[in-house]
Amino acid sequence: LLRRKSHDHAQNHDGDKCLRGASLGYYQSFLNQYKPQCILNKP
């Protein structure tokens, strides 16, 4: 569920880093690293 949501969010943005992090499965690391642009920028 989390990976799907992050992947969907990444598609809605121009975020290669978001998509890469989610697709690799390093959800926690990608969350901590890209939280400002992947999570806080959520429309």
Swiss-Prot record:
It is found in: Secreted. Expressed by the venom gland. This protein autoproteolytically degrades to 10 kDa and 14 kDa fragments in the presence of SDS. Interestingly, the two fragments, as well as reduced crotalin are able to bind vWF, indicating that the binding activity does not require a specific protein conformation. The keyword Zinc applies. It is an enzyme of class 3 (hydrolase). GO terms for cellular component: extracellular region; host extracellular space. Its main location: secreted. Binds 1 zinc ion per subunit. Its cofactor is Zn(2+). Keywords: Disulfide bond, Fibrinogenolytic toxin, Hemorrhagic toxin, Hemostasis impairing toxin, Hydrolase, Metal-binding, Metalloprotease, Platelet aggregation inhibiting toxin, Protease, Secreted, Toxin, Zinc. Zn(2+) binds at residue 13. Belongs to the venom metalloproteinase (M12B) family. P-I subfamily. Snake venom zinc metalloproteinase that inhibits ristocin-induced platelet aggregation by abolishing the binding of von Willebrand factor (vWF) to platelet glycoprotein Ib alpha (GPIBA) through the cleavage of both GP1BA and vWF. Also has fibrinogenolytic activities by degrading the alpha- (FGA) and beta-chain (FGB) of fibrinogen. In vivo, induces a slight hemorrhage when applied to chick chorioallantoic membrane and has potent antithrombic effect. Monomer. This is Snake venom metalloproteinase crotalin. It comes from Crotalus atrox (Western diamondback rattlesnake).
